[in-house]
Every structure is written in structure tokens, then in C-alpha cells.
């Protein structure tokens, strides 16, 4: 097509732009398979990958109060007694789309927060802070019903099953799954968390676990999940990581750290973790500056 453009007063120009490159056309029209059109030799570190913060925080808590509407989800009963009958969705809800809808929209990195309630657990519920997140897809919720209902919670095993099903149907894609130890003021249950996460990943994602190296390509990861886990759990997995270990420092504006795999090599990474934003222009400025710093880092 041809379009006019004014570059300076009194001078007019025109220029022609050809068709969109074939890869870009495919990516724009098919978000469920956008990665398969990228070249195999593209480094994973070169790709801008859409991600989902607290990916399971879709409906809030697994407790429902009275109205039966998805936007009326509430925290635990004891938290309700503390807050009163106040809609606490703003505290827990972070997403509008289900896991399946996020995958179909092109999201490829998912932030999961499993919680260990004891030192010996078989499966892990997904949390947002202190709140167990409800999963209506698993039943236990009757729209329009009166009184409190208990939704089935999101469980790590079943979220991983959904990821594996997606990769079976879309083998050209890859997923990144970030995990951290959630909802605890002590490390009393850390060993149980480590063992449960390792067991769950191995049993649910057998043959789908991507090995991390700093120069891994898309070909190395197609049809697989690259786990990026903040906890150093390798002593509970025979001295090896399942994917990458992310050495993390909490609540810093911007910090540099490393990703580690099993090859002994480390990849540098810059993180913006300024999440505790208060009202006020100065906090917003700090957040935007931190984002800009990280974006600039990716181009250097």
C-alpha cells in the first residue's frame, strides 16, 4: 500500500511498504501456535515471551460468599471474620482468563505459587499470598446458589496436566513455568515443598522437562516446559535441577542475579521486583523507571 508522510513543512513524500513478512502474519493470526513459526536456532533469551503473573488468580479464593457470582469470591473464613463481609477480590484476583484461555491467547510463561501445608504433602494447592485459589473447572461451585460454597482449589498437578495437554496439541510451542515457595513465615515446610514439587513435575511432565543452558534455543525447548524455580531444591532431587534455578532477592527495585542449570554455567539476568507500590506519583515513577531499566538491559 502507499501512504503520504510529511517529514517537514513544505516537503511531501510517499513510500511503499510491502506485505508483512510471512512469519509475522502467522504469529498475528494464530496465537495458539505463534512459536512454531519462529526459527529453531532462535535463542530463548532473544524472544519476548508474554507472561502471566499469579496465573491461577482468576476467581479469587476457593470460598464463595452468597451471591454465586464469579466476581464475588472471598478469602478464608477466618480472614472473612477479620475483614468482615467485604469483597476481597481485589486482594486475590490477578487474571481475567482461564489457564486454557491464556494459552490460546499466546501466553507462554506462567507464574505459579504452590504452598506446602505440612512437611509431608502429596500435592500442592496454588496460592496467591495467604489465599488458596479456587478452580471452578474442577467442580464444587453452583452459580446462583445461596450461602457459602467451597470451590475445589487449584492443585499443582492438575495445572501441569493442562500444560502438558496443550503441548501435546501444539508441539511447536514451549512453556516457561516460574514457581516459588508461597504463604509461609518460616521454612518449616520447605523440605515437604521441595519433595512435592520434584515429585509432581517428574510424574506429570515426564519427557516434557527442558534442560536449561544459557544458550538454549527454541529447538531445545519445543514441546517442553522450562521450569524456573526460585528455591534451591537440588539436594532433594539427587543434586540436579529440573530446568533452571533462579537465585532471587525479594522486594528489590532492580537487581542482577543468575539462572543456573546442571551444566555448571550461569546466565545473567536482571529482575524488577518492585511490587509493593503505594499511592503517590513518586512510587509510580520508580516503577516505570525500573521497567525501563530492564527493557534497556535486554537490548544490550
Where are these regions (language model features)?
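Long, acidic (Asp/Glu-rich), low-complexity accessory segments flanking structured domains
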Residues: 7-105, 118-169, 174, 233
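Solvent-exposed loop/turn segments at secondary-structure junctions
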Residues: 53-55, 109, 114-118, 181-186, ...
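Glycogenin-like
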Residues: 144-212
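Catalytic domains of cell-wall/extracellular-matrix polysaccharide-remodeling enzymes
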Residues: 184-233, 238-247
Amino acid at each position: 500500500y502507499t501512504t503520504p508522510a510529511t517529514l517537514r513543512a513544505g516537503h511531501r513524500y510517499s513510500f511503499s511498504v510491502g506485505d508483512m513478512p510471512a512469519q509475522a502474519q502467522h504469529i498475528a493470526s494464530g496465537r495458539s501456535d505463534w512459536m512454531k513459526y519462529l526459527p529453531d536456532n532462535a535463542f530463548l533469551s532473544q524472544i519476548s515471551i508474554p507472561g502471566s503473573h499469579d496465573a491461577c488468580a482468576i476467581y479469587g479464593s476457593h470460598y464463595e460468599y452468597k451471591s454465586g457470582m464469579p466476581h464475588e469470591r472471598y478469602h478464608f473464613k477466618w480472614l472473612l471474620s477479620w475483614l468482615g463481609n467485604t469483597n476481597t477480590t481485589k486482594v486475590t484476583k490477578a487474571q481475567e482468563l482461564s489457564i486454557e484461555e491464556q494459552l490460546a491467547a499466546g501466553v507462554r510463561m506462567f507464574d505459579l505459587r504452590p504452598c506446602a501445608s505440612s512437611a509431608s504433602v502429596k500435592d500442592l494447592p496454588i496460592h496467591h499470598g495467604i489465599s488458596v485459589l479456587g478452580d471452578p473447572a474442577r467442580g464444587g461451585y453452583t452459580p446462583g446458589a445461596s450461602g457459602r460454597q467451597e470451590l475445589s482449589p487449584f492443585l499443582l498437578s492438575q495445572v501441569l496436566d493442562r500444560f502438558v495437554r496443550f503441548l501435546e496439541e501444539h508441539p511447536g510451542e514451549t512453556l516457561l513455568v516460574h514457581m516459588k515457595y508461597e504463604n509461609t513465615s518460616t521454612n518449616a515446610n520447605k523440605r515437604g515443598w521441595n519433595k512435592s514439587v520434584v515429585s509432581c513435575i517428574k510424574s506429570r511432565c515426564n519427557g516434557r522437562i527442558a534442560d536449561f543452558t544459557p544458550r538454549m534455543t527454541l529447538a531445545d525447548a519445543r514441546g517442553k516446559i522450562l521450569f524456573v524455580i526460585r528455591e534451591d531444591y537440588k539436594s532433594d532431587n539427587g543434586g540436579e535441577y529440573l530446568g533452571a534455578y533462579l537465585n532471587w532477592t525479594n522486594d528489590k527495585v532492580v537487581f542482577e542475579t543468575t539462572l543456573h542449570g546442571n551444566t555448571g554455567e550461569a546466565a545473567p539476568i536482571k529482575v524488577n521486583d518492585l511490587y509493593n507500590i503505594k499511592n503517590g506519583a513518586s512510587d509510580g515513577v520508580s516503577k516505570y523507571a525500573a521497567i525501563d531499566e530492564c527493557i534497556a538491559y535486554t537490548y544490550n
